[in-house]
Amino acid sequence: DSEFVELKIRGKIFKLPILKASIGEDVIDISRVSSEADCFTYDPGFMSTASCRSTITYIDGDKGILRYRGYDIKDLADKSDFLEVAYLLIYGELPSSEQYNNFTKKVAVHSLVNERLHYLFQTFCSSSHPMAIMLAAVGSLSAFYPDLLNFKEADYELTAIRMIAKIPTMAAMSYKYSIGQPFIYPDNSLDFTENFLHMMFATPCMKYEVNPVIKNALNKIFILHADHEQNASTSTVRIAGSSGANPFACISTGIASLWGPAHGGANEAVINMLKEIGSSENIPKYIAKAKDKDDPFRLMGFGHRVYKNYDPRAAVLKETCNEVLKELGQLENNPLLQIAIELEAIALKDEYFIERKLYPNVDFYSGIIYKAMGIPSQMFTVLFAIARTVGWMAQWKEMHEDPEQKISRPR
């Protein structure tokens, strides 16, 4: 039997159905409140509001659980590669060997971008932030694929593959342009992660040999960042998509949202914070500053809007960070890592942080890994966008296949 909750407004009782979740919390359906009760709900930041039905990602923040299509994130990070996870998010199941091979071949074929896009990059000054370039470049793809301007006629699968394939190419192009080096074309003989590293670090006069430890670490980072329920950027993509905007425009809005320091820019902020702390001796002083509500200093990389336990992605990245720095000979002499390890140890024992359930999040160690790889801090959010494009496209595809989908219109 259906369950209801009763809402009493001005003496009149309204019965609101409770929708059963397949896993996690149930949901109260308030969709009729506005029309029948002559009022609507107020929920700043949508802290208690589900905007859609989704079967893509599940999070239990109290228990520190993250699953893609029912698969635990740690299992996927340990046993899968990024395009295998991309297939899982888009299609709902892990691919067979044949499906995986066909999917990866399609992604490789579509990794090349139109030559005329090169001229767009030349319009930016060399000091432009790579995310600013990415915003323009991704949006400009609409001009190269006019057939997708009518989303109802779009091939959702081909659109997703094109986007996943071209974002890393444009990301590497934005980096190369910022440092004055020539663009490097994709190499279809390399896998997804190897190809990106090749486009980032190879030059016409020198081949880049991909370190397998670096490749494995970046593969894990991409998997961990691929999707995360209805966060700010994903919700932005869905809202833009609900109006019928073309997919390239939708993804560019996601990139804009991701650029914010409270969202995708947090790992860059962690690096800046660790540099500001400077040495382990200064940690107690900065812990005190973080506790002082009148002090503008904030401890970046701790706490999460959803997780009230240790972020499962952070646990994977802490281990990965040690592997990368050991491989590069930086495990004992990386000052940022030493500060991060001691800062985490002190914070996890401090009652202030324990009471507020402020644990390290995914951004705490990812920036250290990137920096050790030779990736500059202004590129951190760009790499986040490469990974999250998979989630955005899975969510965009799911939204357009949802019979309940309507144009978003918050009150």
Curated annotation (Swiss-Prot):
Gene3D superfamilies found in the cross-reference section = 2.20.28.60, Citrate Synthase, domain 1 (1.10.580.10), Cytochrome P450-Terp, domain 2 (1.10.230.10)
Provide the Gene Ontology terms for cellular component: cytoplasm
Catalytic activity entry: oxaloacetate + acetyl-CoA + H2O = citrate + CoA + H(+)
| NCBIfam families named among the record's database cross-references | cit_synth_I (TIGR01798), PRK05614.1 (NF004126)
Q: Name one GO biological process term.
A: tricarboxylic acid cycle
Identify the keywords attached in UniProt to this record, alphabetized.
Transferase, Tricarboxylic acid cycle
Instruction: Indicate the enzyme's highest-level EC class.
Output: transferase
UniProt lists the family membership as follows: Belongs to the citrate synthase family.
Q: What is this protein called?
A: Citrate synthase
Hey, which pathway is this one from?
Carbohydrate metabolism; tricarboxylic acid cycle; isocitrate from oxaloacetate: step 1/2
Task: Spell out the note in the miscellaneous section.
Answer: Citrate synthase is found in nearly all cells capable of oxidative metabolism.
Tell me where on the tree of life, at the top rank, the source sits: Bacteria
* UniProt cross-references to SUPFAM superfamilies, sorted A to Z: Citrate synthase
Question: Which Enzyme Commission numbers does its entry carry?
Answer: 2.3.3.16
Q: Which gene encodes it?
A: gltA
Reply yes or no: does the keyword Transit peptide apply: no
Q: What Gene Ontology molecular-function terms does this entry list?
A: citrate (Si)-synthase activity
Active-site residue list: H304, D363
Q: Which InterPro entries match?
A: Citrate_synth-like_lrg_a-sub, Citrate_synth-like_sm_a-sub, Citrate_synthase, Citrate_synthase_AS, Citrate_synthase_bac-typ, Citrate_synthase_sf, Citrate_synthase_typ-I
